[in-house]
């Protein structure tokens, strides 16, 4: 979902006068972005901190979710400041000059869209992990951490490779004494719009359609399998069976909700871009507020995901409380001085206590 490549065609300031928007409107939009930026920075940082501080939370699923949180951190660092600049200075305005400015003109959209690509691929990894855990529970218990690390590295590599053209197509142009960060496929492609259409379709098929179809198929199989497992098994005690089913359903619920949120947040923007490319041809001034709305909804997913994780994952809430409690005591650091002792075990949903010294 290369939102930044299409930025110059679907941004909020498609009118000739970038400042014709009222001050109140600009202030409201800036405030909205500031809010989700703060939530995204704090929420995703908390997920990464808790997962990597508490060893018991370093399961394959949680590591994939932490990886998604790391990618979501790129949104408030690159996408949102860029959007706030456009709100006040106009579409594609670039305020940083020199070689550093040129480098950031290329890297900002690159990191922005790498973030989305890593997120959707991480969701696919979570789905594959859930499928593996439900269908092959014995093998899943001995899954090597190296496999998880390789999968995460592969996800980031794919995201950077497919978006590597950004390093070529994004350039700074001087227009009427002002710098603009714009994309251009020429050379070697003379028809810039046609090149954008082809690239967008390829990215949509590879990074959106294929992962979502895979995720849907895997979760459908998992749901069917879990329903069949509701029948008691002779080789499992009733308590053990119920514990495993509860654990699988809790993680499945979290994973499915995150996927639904992703689809709901990105569908409006994707639809808008399709209409822009294949129906309208050019975004009209009267569509500027709609363009802003769909971009804001898409960017807000980086703030929504941490909230979803906090709501649906009791183990994460406990872990966050433990880390915050330990750090607030000012007598220990979670990685060294916090000794975490299990007091009850329920599959991977352990209850644990923290002692600070």
Q: Residue spans of the language-model regions?
A:
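Intrinsically disordered regulatory tails of 7TM GPCRs
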Residues: 1-18, 228-252, 314-357
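Loop architecture of class A 7-transmembrane GPCRs
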Residues: 11-19, 90-109, 113-114, 136, ...
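First transmembrane helix
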Residues: 25-54
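Extracellular TM2-ECL1-early TM3 structural module of rhodopsin-like
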Residues: 26-34, 61-125, 136, 140
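Fourth transmembrane helix
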Residues: 74, 85-91, 115-125, 132, ...
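Hydrophobic alpha-helical segments of membrane proteins
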Residues: 74-84, 161-164, 168, 209, ...
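Intracellular effector-coupling site of seven-transmembrane GPCRs
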Residues: 183-192, 204-207, 224-269
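Seventh transmembrane helix
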Residues: 214, 261-274, 290-341
